Amino acid sequence: MTDGDGELVYEYFLAHVTHEGLDGAPEIMRRDGAVSDVECERGKKLRREFFARFKTRDLLYFADVDNTVTRRGILSDEKKRFFNGWALSDRVVLSTGKIYKSIEKTARELGVDKNPCCCLNGAVLYDGRGGREIVAKLGEKARPAARILREKGLPYVLYYPDALRVETPLGQKDYENLLRYDEMYLDEKGETDFKRVVKLLAFVDEGDSESEAIVDGAAAAIGLKALRTAPHSYEIVPPLADKGRALKITAKRLGVHFRMTAAVGDSMNDLPMLAVCGLPYAVSDASCELARFGFAVAGSDRNTDLPELFDKVSRGVL
């Protein structure tokens, strides 16, 4: 990717990405008063330039369904419209969601379940031609971290791709928290599908700084980070780089279908993942949310260029 290409992708990222013919982000932002008429026209020009540089056939478009699949497995109309604006063969579902069955339902709803390759999440690749492949394989990798937690007397459970393993005594509160946690992840029958989650879940109350430090250290020991997911628990999960790796594997598996010139996502949290991959990128819903990352937004003098972004990602700032 040349500097010019990078600048083009970055600028296009600021303008949002959308397929020609749809109600694109520049128009939406103008309608909402976020950009001026001049800025809107510039955004549309950048969109045309982007697709002139990175032809549609060279793009890997993916839908991140993390915050779209509800407990009832309902896909938002907005994402349906956006996703359906692309050729069927150019669609891949990429998600770190935990409910595989619900995500599979979404894949069917989007018509990609029979595609050559569909990434259900950062840990599992689903190939319509041959079933699943576990990519992250966190189970064994989590062993050193689990040992640290056990030696320090912290309760945890370890999710393998095929089982939930309770390896430390759980108090009544921990057990209740586990049940409450698992209620979030229901399959199509309304049953908790906790056997298909690839992560280490540690039970630590928010504000218990000593225990929090232990969990952080345990995660760091295996090169991962601990994520606070609830007031009572931490997750140690594969990092965004693993999700990006799954995206690369997906593109490679697709072979002649994609040359991975660029990737187009639909969520702000796709940004660091794509940056980790070292790919030209664009996302669909960037707007004032960019201010959180120090990016330029309409009417703002703040700016962050691509090299600084990649530096932030490499240092784990994003």
Feature-to-residue mapping (PLM):
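Mg2+-dependent phosphoryl-transfer enzymes with acidic/Ser/Thr/Gly-rich catalytic loops
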Residues: T18-G21, A25, M29, F51-T56, ...
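Active-site phosphate-binding/coordination module
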Residues: R72, S76-K173
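Short, structured coil segments at secondary-structure junctions
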Residues: L110-D113, N121, I222, V276-C277, ...
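Conserved acidic, metal-coordinating active-site core of Asp-based
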Residues: T18, R31, S36-E39, K152-P155, ...
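Non-catalytic pre-domain segments flanking phosphatase-related domains
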Residues: D5, V9-A63
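Short hydrophobic/aromatic-enriched beta-strand-loop microsegments
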Residues: K114-L120, I134-V135, E176-L178, P280-D285, ...
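Short, well-ordered alpha-helix to beta-strand connector turns
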Residues: R57-D58, S89-D90, K114, V197-V198, ...
